[in-house]
């Protein structure tokens, strides 16, 4: 595992209390007395606020519904995992041997959780302004074009237009199951056309899972 100094250089912030950073990088699989789950919970809330504020200022004439869609496109597992990869967080996470051997350092869920935890740790030690500075810089590096056309992909609407025109029917989305802790629930959605299952997807919200299932269905139709 690399020296934490390298991560702090990439982050653009040097911790006074490196124990806090270590906690943010400790996965529950280590079975240590502490893990990054509490910091992840905090970091999730902080990032939600920062991204919301950023979009509010950047898109002064955009309505609430569209801003919510933009925020959802940026505040999610995939987005946070992308930012974690930019920081090379996977190389610094403390994992059990089994989890590491199972590709844990590349898992989007683990990377996203660790990123949120690191943001939570920065917030605790340095406050909101420092987290905002780091988060906005990472957002603009990882997403150089932050606008509706580049970020918000409404696969459900696209699929519905195609199926109505070609099949005379609309897709049905069914919840297969929900699982995980209350603050990190995941939802599995099945997409059906004429009572036949076409695709399935799992995400952190029903809406995101539906969009992912619609995207998979669209990709199948192109083949």
Curated annotation (Swiss-Prot):
One of its GO terms (cellular component) is cytoplasm. Mg(2+) binds at residues 40, 113, 116. The keyword tRNA processing applies. It comes from Campylobacter curvus (strain 525.92). NCBIfam families: RNaseIII. SUPFAM superfamilies: dsRNA-binding domain-like, RNase III domain-like. The gene is rnc. Pfam families: dsrm, Ribonucleas_3_3. Homodimer. This is Ribonuclease 3.
